């Protein structure tokens, strides 16, 4: 369930736009005037959300995408904005009520974008809008070749290999005949898959158009590219000479897809239409595997081949190398995300020697003597920026309490265009000049998307502590003070339980799990970086697999006990525990093991019954790796026994505290029967409980009115039991 920060941010913007694809009214930037200085759900949803960002070829301008939302209309609107590279002269280019997304520069004066499922262009001032593609509204992503003679177009095609097509004489039949696993993914049934298509840019009647003659790069192959559920155009790359395309693909279907994370990087030669796998030796055949047992100790992970996730390729500026993110082991989605560098001349590979996951990266200019690559990585609760030279030496460029969430060259060869957020600030755009010799890194904020709202708010202050753990180590714990904090007073306190289970408690800005919203409601937030989280070494992260109810639970209790015992502003008699996904699982488990510490629990989309979860979830590789075995295996491992024996549903007899269970019915990762089961069990035991269930939401809550209902229910419940 763990995903990188960049993918999560990009996918959320994409999914929200999909939910709100049809817009009747032009929804624009909010001029909300707040009645108090405390954050409200309405203020949160009034904020603009920055998405795609790109510098012009001459480095003089920046085009970017922003999402605005209307609570009344219950939908969003994606618009395109432009500004000078120093942040001046910001203006919105979108004037239509239709969303406009994925802006990119065709040349220094022309911007290409998607609207209505087609590729359009406009001048940098928003004029001369022209439609380039004619695909019946099917474009879902695109990328121009460096020579601007060709374009990759992402579009979906029908897929009936697993869910069979219903007979033509039964057009109103709603049943689905399923023949294998992966019949649904994340929040949808898999009845279509994305493929990349190649097209030429042609001049017709003195007008630039995209040829309707599309070449399917994966013609005849039943595989998706980009990869579901979060992959985008970043999973494909052009070579500098525009003759080759590198793409990401997991060439598996059905049960084999469901149990494996083995994706590869492929090279597609446009002239010959031949494809080469860069990650496997020629003739490689994957060993047979036991689909109901972890792949950790199976032959597939002893082959020496690249058998984990390999994705997001980028060619070096001179075309001599390709870099991509690479995981070593099949079946382990939270493996160390390494940066692999492939040499085109001889096929050799090397990996950047780094202690944590590479979240995203970009190549430095070809003539740069200080760096070869720039990348982002989480370390000690912050996602900062780093550079690497040809010697493999890594240098930290930023050292702020923030999460840098995206980076690319600013096209002047000297600066990096990046996005950044924190627990106290939503995403904005920055220009970063990397440190050179004695000159420190220079950081300049160039967008101020939500300044007019932030200036009206009072935020809680953040503190950092290193708390001893029961295994003799220390965990980093973020503590957020209430926005109305007064020295000498005590405040109700929330233990935040992170999901993943290998997602970082870093400086993320969330439009649901927003710490400043909790602070505005008068709560202290205690957020521990327990065992299992990245940014503290691979041993710390990997400890959690097979031990969901052991050390990480002790870490939660160590953090909240430290807060109650050592922080004078924490009211130990009014403690709550909240969390989503694995955090929701943690809440369900704590409900039976907290020894009267807590007065309220909230679990969002959490796993309650692990035996049910094993066969309910769609990405079986996750359950296999984390549990070791299917529950029916007679010779299952001791770790598997421990996992199933400690499933939260087996300790309901010890529940004694009010609980709110939240779930989305379109959540196919942790199916909604988990939340309903927990709620039903609590009520059958006579425990005060509430269930908030969304028929139209997935693992997240994406619609504005549902988001506000979520916030109101969350705080109504906490206020009832903790104040």
Question: What do these predicted regions represent?
Answer:
Residues 24-28, 77-78, 153-220, 248-251, ...:
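Predominantly five- to eight-bladed beta-propeller fold
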Residues 47-62, 97-114, 129, 136-151, ...:
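Conserved beta-propeller blade repeats
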Residues 68-72, 158-161, 252-255, 328-331, ...:
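Short glycine/acidic-enriched loop and turn motifs that connect beta-strands
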Residues 84-88, 123-127, 202-204, 269-273, ...:
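Short loop/turn segments that connect beta-strands within beta-propeller blades
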Residues 441, 448-573, 580, 615:
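Cap/lid segment of the alpha/beta-hydrolase catalytic domain
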Residues 514, 519, 527-723:
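Active-site-proximal cap/loop segments of hydrolase catalytic domains
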């Amino acid at each position: 369930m763990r995903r990188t920060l960049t993918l999560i941010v990009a996918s959320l913007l994409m999914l929200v736009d999909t939910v709100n694809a049809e817009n009747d009214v032009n929804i624009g930037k909010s001029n909300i005037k707040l009645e108090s200085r405390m954050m409200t759900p309405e203020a949160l949803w009034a904020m603009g959300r920055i998405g795609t960002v790109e510098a012009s070829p001459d480095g003089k301008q920046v085009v970017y995408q922003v999402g605005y939302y209307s609570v009344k209309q219950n939908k969003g609107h994606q618009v395109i904005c432009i500004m000078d590279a120093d942040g001046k002269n910001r203006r919105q280019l979108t004037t239509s009520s239709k969303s406009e997304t994925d802006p990119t520069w065709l040349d220094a004066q022309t911007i290409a974008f998607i609207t209505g499922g087609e590729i359009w262009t406009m001048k940098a001032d928003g004029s001369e809008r022209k439609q380039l593609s004619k695909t019946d509204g099917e474009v879902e992503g695109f990328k121009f070749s460096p020579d601007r003679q060709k374009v990759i177009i992402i579009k979906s095609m029908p897929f009936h290999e697993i869910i069979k097509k219903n007979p033509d004489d039964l057009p109103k039949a709603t049943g689905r005949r399923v023949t294998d696993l992966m019949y649904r993914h994340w929040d949808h049934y898999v009845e279509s898959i994305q493929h990349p298509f190649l097209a030429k840019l042609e001049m017709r009647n003195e007008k630039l158009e995209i040829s309707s003659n599309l070449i399917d790069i994966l013609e005849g192959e039943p595989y998706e590219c980009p990869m579901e559920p979060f992959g985008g155009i970043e999973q494909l790359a052009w070579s500098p000479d525009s003759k080759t395309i590198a793409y990401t693909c997991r060439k598996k279907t059905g049960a084999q897809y469901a149990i494996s994370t083995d994706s590869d990087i492929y090279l597609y030669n446009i002239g010959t239409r031949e494809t080469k796998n860069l990650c496997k030796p020629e003739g490689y055949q994957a060993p047979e595997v036991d689909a109901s047992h972890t792949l950790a100790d199976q032959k597939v992970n002893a082959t020496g081949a690249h058998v984990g996730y390999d994705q997001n390729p980028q060619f070096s500026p001179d075309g001599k190398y390709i870099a991509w993110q690479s995981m070593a082991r099949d079946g382990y989605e939270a493996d160390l995300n390494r940066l692999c560098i492939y040499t085109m001349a001889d096929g050799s590979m090397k990996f950047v020697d780094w202690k944590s996951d590479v979240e995203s990266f970009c190549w430095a200019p070809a003539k740069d003597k200080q760096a070869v690559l720039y990348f982002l990585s989480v370390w000690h609760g912050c996602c900062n920026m780093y550079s690497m030279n040809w010697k493999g030496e890594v240098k930290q460029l930023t050292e702020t309490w923030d999460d840098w969430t995206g980076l690319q060259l600013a096209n002047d060869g000297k600066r990096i265009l990046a996005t950044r957020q924190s627990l106290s600030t939503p995403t904005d755009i920055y220009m970063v000049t990397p440190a050179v010799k004695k000159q420190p890194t220079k950081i300049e904020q160039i967008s101020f998307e939500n300044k007019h709202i932030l200036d009206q708010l009072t935020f809680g202050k953040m503190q950092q502590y290193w708390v001893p753990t029961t295994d003799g180590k220390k965990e980093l714990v973020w503590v957020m003070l209430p926005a109305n904090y007064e020295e000498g007073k005590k405040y109700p306190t929330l233990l935040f339980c992170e999901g993943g289970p290998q997602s970082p408690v870093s400086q993320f800005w969330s439009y649901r799990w927003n710490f400043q919203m909790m602070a505005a409601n008068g709560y202290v937030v205690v957020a521990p970086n327990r065992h299992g989280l990245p940014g503290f070494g691979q041993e710390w992260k990997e400890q959690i697999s097979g031990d969901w109810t052991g050390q990480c639970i002790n870490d939660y209790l160590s953090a909240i006990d430290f807060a109650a015992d050592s922080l004078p502003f924490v009211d130990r008699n009014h403690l709550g525990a909240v969390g989503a996904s694995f955090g929701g699982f943690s809440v369900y488990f704590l409900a039976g093991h907290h020894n009267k510490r807590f007065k309220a629990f909230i679990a969002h989309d959490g796993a309650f019954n692990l035996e049910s979860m094993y066969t309910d979830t769609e990405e079986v590789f996750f359950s296999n790796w984390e549990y070791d075995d299917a529950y029916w295996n007679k010779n299952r491992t001791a770790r598997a026994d421990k996992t199933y024996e400690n499933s939260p549903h087996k300790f309901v007899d010890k529940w004694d505290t009010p609980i709110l269970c939240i779930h989305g019915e379109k959540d196919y990762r942790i199916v909604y029967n988990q939340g309903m089961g927990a709620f039903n069990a609590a009520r059958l035991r006579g425990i005060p409980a509430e269930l908030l269930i969304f028929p139209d939401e997935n693992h997240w809550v994406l619609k504005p009115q549902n988001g506000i209902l979520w916030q109101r229910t969350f705080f109504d419940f906490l206020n009832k039991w903790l104040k």
